[in-house]
Amino acid sequence: MLLSDRDLRAEISAGRLGIDPFDDSLVQPSSVDVRLDCMFRVFNNTRYTHIDPAQRQDELTSAVEPTKGDPFVLHPGEFVLGSTLEIFSLPGDLAGRLEGKSSLGRLGLLTHSTAGFIDPGFSGHITLELSNVANLPITLWPGMKIGQLCILKLTSPSEHPYGSSGVGSKYQGQRGPTPSRSYQNFIRST
């Protein structure tokens, strides 16, 4: 069940759904707008010959923060990691779905490539996978609305929410754009 604006406010007021900082004006009919933080991770295209999800590649990305008051410029065909300004905390019976903003999609900005699902129990900033599919650079302003988070009520609380021992919650408590940790639980078929 997708939560309405009324249900979202009730979950936030009850302290079950955490959004910090929270701005009530960002609550939409069935989602909460999320804003862009000021930190990004750009890919170092000369450090490795290829990307291998089975290997730890610490120098694959570098942290970048634009000068205060300046935007980050995302060039055509470029892919970078960003994050939400807000920290989210979901209880064991709520999950999230991150979606892009229609107005930004119409400019050629993709907010996430594949990882739009937020597990019940997650706590932290949401990492954004930002791509420019337009033919011109796009300026990304820290604090701008970058997407919307829909909250879904599970039919029953998760038995092992994200962050529980044994679940392999690699990104619990993440701060800012967090690079891939796929190597930590990579499985190859034999």
UniProtKB/Swiss-Prot annotation:
One of its GO terms (biological process) is dUMP biosynthetic process. DCTP binds at residues 101-106, 119, 127-129, 148, 162, 174. Residues 161-190 are annotated as: Disordered. Its EC number is 3.5.4.30. The gene is dcd. Pfam families: DCD. It comes from Mycobacterium ulcerans (strain Agy99). This is dCTP deaminase, dUMP-forming. Homotrimer. It comes from the Bacteria.
